[in-house]
UniProtKB/Swiss-Prot annotation:
It catalyses: urea + 2 H2O + H(+) = hydrogencarbonate + 2 NH4(+). The gene is ureB1. Heterotrimer of UreA (gamma), UreB (beta) and UreC (alpha) subunits. Three heterotrimers associate to form the active enzyme. This is Urease subunit beta 1. Signal peptide: none annotated. It holds the Pfam family Urease_beta. The lineage of its organism: Bacteria, Pseudomonadati, Pseudomonadota, Alphaproteobacteria, Hyphomicrobiales. SUPFAM superfamilies: Urease, beta-subunit. One of its GO terms (cellular component) is urease complex. Keywords: Cytoplasm, Hydrolase, Virulence.
């Protein structure tokens, strides 16, 4: 072994394996870019993003931890969401939940 070496198993790692997903169309109706991080409660993102918020309640982006999706002004794109896991308690963000889902 070489100091600092990382030995991994063969094959790809599938993110959020076995988790239910929701795909929805999101549009930036604002005049500024909006970036949403991997673990942000999607229901509570910037109000200038137009989508079915109720479908996004308790969900986050299905992307790698520490990454983000950027929405340019006027841009529409499909995103895939997965449930927020753990205790399923939401605090902060835009303070729309502040407790258990």
């Amino acid at each position: 072994m070489i100091p600092g070496e990382i030995i991994t198993l063969e094959g790809d790692i599938e993110l959020n394996q076995g988790q239910p997903t929701v795909t929805m169309r999101v549009a930036n109706t604002g005049d500024r870019p909006i970036q949403v991080g991997s673990h942000f409660h999607f229901y509570e993102v910037n109000a200038a993003l137009s989508f079915d918020r109720e479908k996004a309640r308790g969900q986050r982006l299905d992307i790698a931890a520490g990454t983000a999706v950027r929405f340019e002004p006027g841009q529409e794109r499909d995103v895939t969401l997965v449930p927020i896991r753990g205790h399923r308690e939401i605090y902060g963000f835009r303070q729309m939940i502040m407790g258990k889902l």
